[in-house]
């Protein structure tokens, strides 16, 4: 017999993990299904060393550490976390949903989508023949910072993440350079100010025109935008941060038909989608005034969970405070 859950949360990033914790506080039988081999979502998978400063209660915390703390918090209340498992179909039944994954099948009374931007892949350099250098001399994901200690590093990109990486490596690298194809950076004003005050060498407006493996490190040709001028440079390693292409293509294979706006799930003020007992939170939703912050997602989770519990168990006791559960 297929196991029945009150709430199945699809997505184990910060939004899904905190919603799973709160669902456990409401004593809902809850599971989280995450396609990646670790909890924490895109931030933890792609930028584990990145510092996060906009989560309440932390002056600053590494993405990997935030993910670990959220996972630990979620497991405290008995919420099950299923890693490395992908939802391949959701079928509507009379008063529940049948969820099929690549590994198992489950029944659930309600679904909470916390899928973020869906599957994501890095935008790579437009230079052929570099695959053999990936994760050796060219990086599209951030490994442990120790990989870059006492080395000459080039970071390519113009957004907040590229600036964050350059500033994070500044204290440990031999030298840090940041190349961007525009004169102005797209980062937040405070980040750009920190960059200007740092020892990071900024090279603008340049585009990477060629990369060649050297005996030690790599040779990088930079082309100045608007001219034919080329600059020959040499670095030990290159970190490319051109952003990511994302899609929720897997959802197109599901039997249920969810309304989307600009490839995001359309929800109301209670995080409800167009389908009964299916809710959505986090970066993958759209509503008036939506802010794509982890802190915002932390608030959306309890709103959705409380509404689910009101729908499933109208007579059940309402929200509780955490101290009433853990201080006994």
UniProtKB/Swiss-Prot annotation:
Cofactor note: Binds 1 FAD per subunit.
UniProt enzyme class: oxidoreductase
Record has Membrane as a keyword: no
Enzyme Commission no: 1.18.1.2
Gene3D superfamilies from the UniProt entry: FAD/NAD(P)-binding domain
InterPro entries: FAD/NAD-bd_sf, FAD/NAD-binding_dom, Fd--NADP_Rdtase_type_2, Ferredoxin-NADP_redctase_2
Residues holding FAD: 34, 42, 47, 87, 120, 283, 323
Protein name: Ferredoxin--NADP reductase
GO MF terms held by the record: ferredoxin-NADP+ reductase activity; flavin adenine dinucleotide binding; NADP binding
Listed cofactors: FAD
